[in-house]
């Protein structure tokens, strides 16, 4: 598991959905949980959304919603869907900045 990977999240309380791993690579092996941004097909056009599509390697169009982040146990993250490049990760970081104001 690495930063930038989009994996299937299998949380018992949520429908199965893609989740982008944002935890830094140096920490992943030492942690039980990782920080993720969850994807949804419910596109609202918010400045905190990053659109992804089949051209990005996703199975269908969706958005990564920086207003919907979570710390998930690594065991909840399953198969790899795609690894995002640095430009896409930068878009997600800008969306997180807008979402949190940090």
Per-segment meaning from a language model:
Residues 15-54:
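Compact nucleic-acid interaction/catalytic patches
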Residues 5, 17, 62:
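Short beta-strand or tight-loop elements
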Residues 1-9:
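Short coil-to-beta transition motif at edge beta-strands of beta-rich domains
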Residues 56-102:
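C-terminal terminal-subdomain/extension
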């Amino acid at each position: 598991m690495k930063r930038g990977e989009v994996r299937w999240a299998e949380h018992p309380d949520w429908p199965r959905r893609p989740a982008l791993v944002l935890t830094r690579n140096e920490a992943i092996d030492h942690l039980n949980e990782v920080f993720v941004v969850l994807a949804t097909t419910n596109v609202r056009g918010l400045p905190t959304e990053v659109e992804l599509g089949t051209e990005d390697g996703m199975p269908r169009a969706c958005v990564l919603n920086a207003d919907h982040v979570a710390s998930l146990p690594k065991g909840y993250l399953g198969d790899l869907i795609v690894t995002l490049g640095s430009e896409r990760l930068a878009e997600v970081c800008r969306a997180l900045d807008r979402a949190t104001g940090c």
